[in-house]
Amino acid sequence: MGLHYLFGFCLALFSFSAIAAGPVSTEVAAGTTTYRVTNTTVRTPPNVTLSPVRDITPYVEKIPNKGLAQAAQGRLIVAQRAASVPVTGFFNVSGAVVKSGAKSFLRSAGRASGIGLGLAALLEAADWVFDEEGEIVKPLPGGGSPVLMPRPVILNEYTVTGSAGQWSISKEYEPDPRSVPGWYSYNGNPVWVSAVEDVGFTWRYWYFADVLMDGQGRPNYLVAYSDSGPNEYWQDVGGYSLDSLPTEPEFVPLTDAELEAGIDQYYEPDPDDWRNLFPYIEPDSFTIETPIPSLDLSPVVSSSTNNQTGKVTVTETTTSVDFEVSDNNSSQPSISVNETTTENVYVDGDLVSSETNTTVTNPPSSGTSTPPSSGSGSDFQLPSFCSWATAVCDWFDWTQEPIDEEPDLSGIISDIDDLERTKDISFGSKSCPAPIALDIEFLDMSVDLSFEWFCELAGIIYFMVMASAYVLAAYITLGVVRG
């Protein structure tokens, strides 16, 4: 009796292991960013298997609340029927997981190139960049210095007096500032020379600018002057804030709070970001596209002939399989199988009876369990196997009882020769077997072995054999008549 209790313990332990709901079951094709379904992605009845379809390039789309979803193809294979139907599902990544993945990606060094459209728009809107070491940084407000010409031109001294004070300038330039505006160096200070403007006649004038320093010796204001012709009279034509000058900004690293705030404010995930986010995200639910196509099997036909009446009875059995999805958009959706069988009986071509039966097969229940709270002083114990599997225990006990002597059945067994005999002749349903999915692990790929070409060849051979049989029958018939 100890054996069946050990069997009960193992069965109960297996049931308990299926109770706890885990993450979405996936597999990743090597060297890709594509999730594929596994046989445990969806709960199915024992006679149904979910097989992945080889797909390297992921199809990704947006879902509500700033999430992303990747489509995955598979096939539901019904064992007893040797047939399968295609099924499409989506591995869903919620907005919270996507944002966490974006943060991890931006924090990873060396990821400054090849970013997706959504992440690129985030960097543009938040004014963030990657530095040379691959770290995400932001410009320092108010920082930087004026951009000087790579090769400053030293101006010759020429002194004039104007309303703005005494300035050292030059009439001779290399290159001529009338054609090359930009920053120039004069007496060690940056000087801006703008474009030339025509003021009429043959006279021209151009602008000069000087940078005023603040108390700390930093440039903070720009004053412009103009030379109005041969009299070299200088006048103040206005000032410009240094903020409007071209500068080389200084950058500082982002804090975690700034990074999270920027992602919350500016980030709109794009399917193009999938390749960047993939190493940092995991799907948190799976959605099956419904309805799943029905499986309509070829009818099975059998016939019999009554030797006394000569009547021919034909029985036609048709079967269709429907799939019903429950717990969709969860960590492990369920698929139930509804199998409908219709049996029509014909006698000499007339329908005499019709019967339809439907069988529903559900996947094994995962069950529920509530572990004891910590500090309760009681340990979790598995229930007694025979307390919930009484029928199994009773049957096992019955098999252990000694077998009685074989009874004498000669009084109820007799040889009866005068019985009606029937003969069923069937050549099958002419249906082609379903493809067989072969997983080649060392190549990390799945191959569907199809029998379509063989079935087409068999169909051609069938007609050739039947034609040959008719010709042979005609030859035999003619030989008998002539003989």
Curated annotation (Swiss-Prot):
Species per Swiss-Prot/TrEMBL record: Pseudomonas phage Pf3 (Bacteriophage Pf3)
Alphabetical list of NCBIfam families matching this protein: VF_TspB_C_term
UniProt protein name: Attachment protein G3P
Subunit structure and binding partners: Interacts with G6P; this interaction is required for proper integration of G3P and G6P into the virion. Interacts with G8P. Interacts with the tip of the host pilus.
Biased composition range(s): Polar residues: 326-343
GO-annotated cellular components: host cell membrane; membrane; virion component
Biological role: Plays essential roles both in the penetration of the viral genome into the bacterial host via pilus retraction and in the extrusion process. During the initial step of infection, G3P mediates adsorption of the phage to its primary receptor, the tip of host type IV PAO pilus. Attachment of the phage causes pilus retraction bringing the viral particle into close proximity of the host cell inner membrane. Subsequent interaction with a secondary host entry receptor induces penetration of the viral DNA into the host cytoplasm.
Transmembrane segments: 460-480
InterPro entries the record matches: Neisseria_TspB
